[in-house]
């Protein structure tokens, strides 16, 4: 993460935090807007946003990307796509790029500076996707780009751990479960990678986001998962993998989680910056 001065941004960040803390009330005031193929998502009203706007150079910065770019959701009448294989598609209207687009919009509405990398990392083979997404990250950082947060946005695979439930309901909206994943880089045998993430710091961020998510929409976030893989999280502190729903969710349910994630990050960032 970049270090930043606190003084001139305090009022703006407090405004962000106040807006995000009011997540439930703000969500009830959000207006539905139409997106292609009649999938409804929610967008904050302009007059609900913080009045103290951050200057571009002061905005907290986020990089969004998708190592498993073609992951997709359950097809519905309003979300029909041509699959590359089951629950996967090249169609950017229905794969993880659509979720990243929506999350980027929600974050920008809350004052974040967002870069959304839309590179497809799966071709020519899924097994090399993390190597290719790492090359993108290293190239950006070597070019001098800096980010407060680097999020790899995925969707989970449905399993019995979900106990048949995929969503929480809030104000008539079905919101897909979210899960934060932290990589230790130790590897399955303990030998691991030469370069490993500062995973305790990433875990601290993941837990703070999980708590903020569940405060905004009770039960929406599952417990943080810590795994032995690296998931490219060694490139920076503030690097996490975010699972937005699973393959049994609909795209609409995944999109409904994006405003909640954005609100949670605004709250967490304000609290961390003003400490």
Indicate residue ranges for each PLM-predicted region.
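Solvent-exposed coil/turn segments that connect beta secondary-structure elements
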Residues: 65-70, 154-156, 183-185, 245-247
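Structural recognition of the beta-strand scaffold that forms the well-ordered cores
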Residues: 63-65, 114-116, 149-152, 179-181, ...
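Active-site-adjacent substrate-binding region
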Residues: 198-225
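N-terminal Lys/Arg-rich, disordered targeting/topogenic segments
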Residues: 1-7
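A short, glycine/acidic-enriched catalytic loop
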Residues: 83-86, 159-197
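Loop/turn elements at helix/coil->beta-strand transitions in domains of secreted/extracellular proteins
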Residues: 110-113, 145-149, 175-177, 220, ...
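Active-site-adjacent mobile loop/cap segments within catalytic or ligand-binding domains
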Residues: 219-275
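N-terminal catalytic or cofactor-binding beta/alpha core of small enzyme domains
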Residues: 11-148, 156-165, 255, 259, ...
